[in-house]
Amino acid sequence: MHFSTLFGAAATAALAGSTNASPLARRQVPVGTPILQCTQPGLVALTYDDGPFTFTPQLLDILKQNDVRATFFVNGNNWANIEAGSNPDTIRRMRADGHLVGSHTYAHPDLNTLSSADRISQMRHVEEATRRIDGFAPKYMRAPYLSCDAGCQGDLGGLGYHIIDTNLDTKDYENNKPETTHLSAEKFNNELSADVGANSYIVLSHDVHEQTVVSLTQKLIDTLKSKGYRAVTVGECLGDAPENWYKA
């Protein structure tokens, strides 16, 4: 189940309607309401789900080489355990490099299949892990499978979460082979409008897929820059100052 685009329009309207606010410091990002796009045109938020994983450090290198900040929606224990091996160092590096770290739940369940108590537990477990790793807890999240009904949205809103959807899915998980990754790059190019003054995008990819890291990401960056877009974190995309990206 995909979030309704109606929620995206409502969230954008709520963000845009903030009065007497500076572009960054005072804009209020809605909680408990799925958000599909940025609050001003010309911005692209590259987002990566399911990590950290083997390929994530290389992705961080590529982003740094291109002077690009991105957003990582991390799991606690999915492809890898967030607190095992070098993963804590990877999380700390994400933040040190200026990226936004959000939650993708602890174990990647479909939140619509869980009770309220279990949904809350999934989110709290990630918060506890990230506090142990680097002393922070996310305020941004993306639901696994983009699946979050009204009850789920209510629970996440009660926890103070900004729910991030997407309006451009690269489908990289379908094209994780050297001979097919170009299909995701072409999809991105085709769906990224040339009308920079009227469009913005929250782009969905996954740092657990090798071709996304070694091939696709550079193509995404080159394409968005060639069309005149600027790559930003989801927080900047929504006019949210960095000091507001995490819970106290």
Swiss-Prot record:
Compartment(s) where it occurs, according to its Swiss-Prot or TrEMBL record: Secreted
Site feature: Prevents de-N-acetylated sugar residues from interacting with the active site: 171
Residue ranges annotated for the NodB homology domain, each copy included: 42-232
EC number assigned by the record: 3.5.1.41
UniProt record, GO biological process: cell wall organization; chitin catabolic process; polysaccharide catabolic process
SUPFAM superfamilies: Glycoside hydrolase/deacetylase
Top-level taxon in the UniProt lineage: Eukaryota
GO annotation, cellular component aspect: extracellular region
Entry cofactors: Co(2+)
Applications: Recombinant chitin deacetylase could be used to produce chitosan oligomers or polymers from chitin, this reaction is currently achieved by thermochemical alkaline deacetylation. Due to its properties, chitosan has many biological and industrial applications such as the production of films or fibers.
CDD domains: CE4_ClCDA_like
Catalytic activity reported: [(1->4)-N-acetyl-beta-D-glucosaminyl](n) + n H2O = chitosan + n acetate
Cysteines engaged in disulfide bonds, as pairs: 38-237, 148-152
Assembly: Monomer.
Protein name (Swiss-Prot/TrEMBL): Chitin deacetylase
